[in-house]
Each structure stands twice: as C-alpha cells, then as structure tokens.
C-alpha cells in the first residue's frame, strides 16, 4: 500500500466478517501471552468528557508487528436522538512506519473480542466443553456472546434469563439463527445442570446471588465501574478468582472491588493459559477488557484480509 492508496474502512457488517470467532479466539490466546510478557504495550484508557454526560475513550496499543488505536464515544442521550449510544473506530497502523492500514467499526470490535475473551476463559478454566451455559441479560453483549459461544461450543445448550420471561423468549427468537441451541430459562431458578454462568447486564447491583460451587464457572462481563457489581459479594469471596487484565481490573472490576478481595490472590488469564493456576474449587472469571485485545482483533482482521488477497 502506497501513501496515496485509499485506506480501507470497514463498517459493522464487514468488520464482523473479518473477525470470525475461531480465528479471533486463537489470536487472543497469543495476545494474552504477549501482553503478559511485555510484548504488547497497552496503557490504561484515557477518558475525556463530552457534552450531555458523554465520554470519549482513547485506547492505544502497540506490538512489534502492529499498532492500534480505538477511539470510542459513549453518548447516553443518543437513544432519544435515534442514534447509537456507542460510536467509534479501531485503526490499525504499521508498527515501524506508522502508516495507517485499515479501520474497523469500534463497537463491533469491542463486542466480538469481549465475547471471544469469555470463550477463551471458559476453555481455559472449565476443562471439558460446557454442556449448559446460562446467559444473564438480553442486550447487545448477550447477543454477541450467544453467537460466539454457539460458534466455539456448538454442542452446548445456551439458556437465557432476562428481566422477564417475555424478554428472554423474544431474545431467543431473534438470535436463534446465530445460536440454534438458544432457549429461554424455564422460571427464575437456576438448574443444577448449568455449568457456566455469564452475567451480561448493565445492572449496578447483583443479578447472580447463588452460592459459589465447584463445577460451575461464573463469568462476569457487564459491570465495568468500581461501584457496580453483577455478582454477589459472598459468591465472589468464596470463589477462586481470575481476571483478563490485572492492571485494569483493579480500577474497573466492580464485582471484585465491591467484595473487597485480596488482589494478591487474584490470578490472571495468562497464568491459567500458562499452566500455573490450579483450577480446583469454585471459579470466577472477571473480564474488563483492554486495548491489547483490540490489537488481537486487528491481527485477526489483517490475517483475514491477507487470506482474501491470496485467494
């Protein structure tokens, strides 16, 4: 690509097509190891205020082969304007020359890499492929997770609990084409057969209060501020804890912060993938995300584009 060549800019649908979940999962596994080894630089995100309660989030990252920058605007008032609440792009650059290579849709990158990190955590922590997964939530994050988990664990039943039986049923009907084994949870009680629970809500108070139990992995995704917790503090304190990004988790993992956990006893996903973590006992995986995972998504897109050109 020369300096005068047009820069490819991909919309949400095209971005999703470049980020197939199996490929994204494999790239994320390598990125987790690279980040832990200091081979990916991923500073804490910069938050800049916008008008009407909005914020601009700047999240750069760099490695030897690629540099990326996610710039996302979150504007809570956009719903009333008929606009998306979250807007933004992830741009990829040559790590040596700084030349821009392509741009991806920011919310799509975030949604898909977040769901892929959950799948990676389940693979690493659960051992055998799960048979029954419960998704708590019926929003966009739940939709991304339904598609991702159906792709990675095609034999698993995906149960859904929403704020009502009707919302869960409507969600399943809307997304069953992407996740054929999607079913609404029958009642409020969580069956003993559920071996993985994933919380995917915007609730600031616990939506999961079950006692910690061996054989059931709990994954917290929705809470992303220090004062919000989807998982009951007693459940958190009784579990062995793993986070995707230890640096970010200390500021953003509200489930753990509210429970006042001892951070010396919190392991990283890199520890698990590296084989230094004992998976016995009740397990809880908290995902907060970081720019290194966006870089992994850009690596996946880069490789997909190269395969298209070669084919």
Swiss-Prot record:
<dbReference type="GO" id="GO:0050241">
    <property type="term" value="F:pyrroline-2-carboxylate reductase activity"/>
</dbReference>
<dbReference type="GO" id="GO:0042562">
    <property type="term" value="F:hormone binding"/>
</dbReference>
<dbReference type="GO" id="GO:0047125">
    <property type="term" value="F:delta1-piperideine-2-carboxylate reductase activity"/>
</dbReference>
<comment type="function">
    <text>Catalyzes the reduction of both Delta(1)-pyrroline-2-carboxylate (Pyr2C) and Delta(1)-piperideine-2-carboxylate (Pip2C) to L-proline and L-pipecolate, respectively, using NADPH or NADH as the electron donor. Can also catalyze the reverse oxidation reactions, albeit at a much lower rate. Together with LhpH, is involved in a trans-3-hydroxy-L-proline (t3LHyp) degradation pathway to L-proline, which allows A.brasilense to grow on t3LHyp as a sole carbon source. Also appears to be involved in D-proline and D-lysine metabolism. Does not show ornithine cyclodeaminase (OCD) activity.</text>
</comment>
<dbReference type="InterPro" id="IPR023401">
    <property type="entry name" value="ODC_N"/>
</dbReference>
<comment type="subunit">
    <text>Homodimer.</text>
</comment>
<keyword id="KW-0520">NAD</keyword>
<comment type="pathway">
    <text>Amino-acid degradation.</text>
</comment>
<dbReference type="Pfam" id="PF02423">
    <property type="entry name" value="OCD_Mu_crystall"/>
</dbReference>
<comment type="similarity">
    <text>Belongs to the ornithine cyclodeaminase/mu-crystallin family.</text>
</comment>
<keyword id="KW-0521">NADP</keyword>
<keyword id="KW-0560">Oxidoreductase</keyword>
<protein>
    <recommendedName>
        <fullName>Delta(1)-pyrroline-2-carboxylate/Delta(1)-piperideine-2-carboxylate reductase</fullName>
        <ecNumber>1.5.1.1</ecNumber>
    </recommendedName>
</protein>
<dbReference type="GO" id="GO:0005737">
    <property type="term" value="C:cytoplasm"/>
</dbReference>
<dbReference type="InterPro" id="IPR036291">
    <property type="entry name" value="NAD(P)-bd_dom_sf"/>
</dbReference>
<dbReference type="InterPro" id="IPR053444">
    <property type="entry name" value="Pyr2C_reductase-like"/>
</dbReference>
<dbReference type="InterPro" id="IPR003462">
    <property type="entry name" value="ODC_Mu_crystall"/>
</dbReference>
């Amino acid at each position: 690509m020369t300096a005068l060549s047009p820069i490819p800019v991909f919309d949400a649908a095209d971005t999703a097509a470049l980020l197939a979940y199996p490929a994204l999962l494999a790239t994320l596994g390598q990125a987790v190891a690279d980040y832990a080894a200091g081979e990916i630089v991923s500073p804490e995100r910069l938050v800049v205020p916008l008008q009407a309660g909005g914020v601009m989030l700047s999240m750069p990252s760099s490695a030897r082969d690629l540099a990326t920058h996610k710039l996302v605007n979150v504007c809570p008032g956009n719903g009333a304007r008929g606009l998306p609440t979250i807007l933004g792009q992830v741009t990829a650059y040559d790590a040596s020359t700084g030349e821009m290579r392509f741009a991806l849709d920011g919310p799509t990158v975030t949604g898909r890499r977040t769901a892929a990190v959950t799948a990676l955590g389940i693979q690493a922590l659960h051992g055998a492929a799960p048979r029954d997964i419960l998704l708590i939530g019926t929003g966009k994050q739940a939709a991304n997770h339904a598609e991702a988990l159906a792709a990675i664990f095609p034999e698993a039943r995906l149960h859904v609990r929403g704020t009502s039986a009707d919302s869960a049923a409507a969600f399943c009907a809307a997304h069953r084409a992407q996740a054929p084994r999607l079913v609404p949870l029958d009642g409020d009680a969580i069956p003993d057969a559920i071996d993985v629970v994933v919380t995917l809500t915007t609730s600031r108070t616990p939506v999961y209060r079950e006692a910690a139990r061996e054989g059931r992995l709990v994954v917290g995704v929705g809470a992303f501020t220090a004062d919000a917790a989807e998982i009951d503090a007693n459940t958190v304190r009784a579990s062995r804890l793993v986070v995707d990004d230890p640096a970010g988790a200390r500021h953003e993992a509200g489930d753990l912060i509210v429970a006042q956990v001892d951070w010396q006893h919190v392991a990283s996903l890199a520890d698990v993938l590296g084989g230094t973590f004992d998976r016995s006992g009740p397990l809880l995986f908290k995902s907060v995300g970081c720019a290194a995972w966006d870089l992994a998504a850009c690596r996946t897109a880069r490789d997909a584009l190269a395969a298209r050109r070669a084919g």
